[in-house]
A protein has these predicted regions:
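N-terminal secretory signal peptides that target proteins for export/translocation
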Residues: 1-2
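Bacterial N-terminal signal peptides
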Residues: 5-16
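Cell-envelope and extracellular/periplasmic
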Residues: 20-248
Length: 249
């Protein structure tokens, strides 16, 4: 999961010239890989490429909601929260190596959630966690806070890492392409960002879920690729070639 964001950052910085916008805002959303489930900060720090990578960044604004009720109170400085962290940490450091522009990250993630229901823009059914609405509200609130501070901003991109749980949903796995298209169209509409870039992280065949469900993984991956190939503002970020976890193949 952690090396994944270096690929995203390098791809994005190659695709977009550094602009002199006062605050560059990046959005992060998805399920467990985005949330940072099963991460171990102490173990990561022992791996040479990530030495000191988890130190707080006081010059990066950060707003987050993860799981049921773990959230920041408005903007805070970017740091590891509890014992979990997602790709936002190394993304920010990779960004900082390339640019000194003001940076702000907004993240909403919850493990074990589906696009067909929990992230559905229409709210899903009565069992839905209503994460799309929660995410949009968080983004709008934080952007309003920037305005109150007299700052201008530009939403640069959304990093989306999700799909594992839709593999097990009889409707979700068959309609993932349509649901992802709808999700992207709606978020662009609701945030008034018709040209918003979307980076879609590949769901991996590694781990027990991927190894035991290769047919379903392929189904979701093909759906992701269909969206990428039809929208020049959507990019696919391969992850299956990366280590499943630090210290493991």
């Amino acid at each position: 999961m952690t090396p994944f964001i270096f690929t995203i950052s390098a791809t994005f910085l190659c695709l977009s010239a550094l602009a002199a916008e006062p605050v560059r805002v990046f959005l992060f959303a998805g399920q467990s890989n985005m949330e940072g489930a099963d991460t171990d900060p102490k173990l990561v720090e022992t791996f040479p490429p990530f030495h000191n990578a988890l130190r707080p960044l006081e010059n990066v604004r950060y707003s987050y909601q993860t799981g049921a009720d773990h959230k920041s109170k408005g903007w805070t400085n970017l740091r590891v929260v509890g014992n979990n962290f997602g790709p936002e940490i190394t993304f920010a450091r990779a960004f900082r190596q390339q640019s000194k522009h003001p940076l702000a990250l907004i993240k909403d993630a919850w493990g074990g959630t589906t696009l067909v229901n929990d992230w559905a823009p229409n709210g899903g059914d009565e069992k839905s966690r209503k994460l799309y609405q929660r995410f949009i509200t968080q983004v709008r609130d934080r952007l309003a806070d920037l305005k109150k501070q007299g700052l201008t901003y530009k939403i640069e991109a959304l990093m989306w890492h999700q799909g594992e749980n839709d593999m097990f949903h009889p409707i979700g796995k068959q309609h993932y392409e349509k649901n992802l298209r709808n999700f992207i169209a709606k978020i662009r509409e609701d945030l008034s960002t018709p040209e918003l870039k979307i980076f879609v992280g590949e769901i991996s065949t590694k781990g027990i879920w991927g190894m035991d469900n290769r047919a379903n993984v392929t189904l979701i991956r093909n759906a992701q690729m269909a969206v990428v190939e039809s929208d020049p503002k959507v990019f696919f970020v391969p992850t299956s070639h990366l280590s499943f976890k630090i210290g493991r193949p």
